[in-house]
Amino acid sequence: ITRFARFAGLAGLPAVLPPFANAAWLSVVPEFNPFKYNSFPVNGARQSYRLTDALQSQIQRLARADQLGSLPPVLTFQSVIDFTVSTPAILTALYANLPDNGSEIVLFDVNRTLKFAPLLRPASYVAIDRLAPTEPATYRFTTIANANDDSEMTVERSIAPGQLQAAVRPLNLPYPPGIFSLSH
């Protein structure tokens, strides 16, 4: 959640007047996805920001006091092209503060087979590389991706805590037909 979300409440102020009731929503769009709401209320944005800000402050405070040692392992599944939750923020605000306790982030790469190439931005092809640890980390960094650009078969590339080299394991599973990104 960006820092600008703290101002979301201002966008809803006109909603106190009946002709401007729609101002209570940041976006109102048709609801076609049974697994996710498409419309988003201003109060939802404000509450999301407040919760995220409080959690980040608490994580940073506990990390500085070296009190995260008793935290159970954290397991996160994330698509590298998910724009709802920032993958770099997960890595910097959460995982960079975690102790070596068995935590793992699992990132789903885009389906790199040629049939989807026209749909993807060039930045999509380097997202995993930009997110991979450049120095040993305290958590396992795992990606699920195509075995290569010509294959629909997937592999797991996993960098163990304290390491920089990925171990590759074939999953013997293809990307589902017609899917260009696996997500949450």
Language model segments and positions:
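Hydrolase active-site cap/lid region
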Residues: 2-50, 72
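Serine-hydrolase catalytic core
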Residues: 33-184
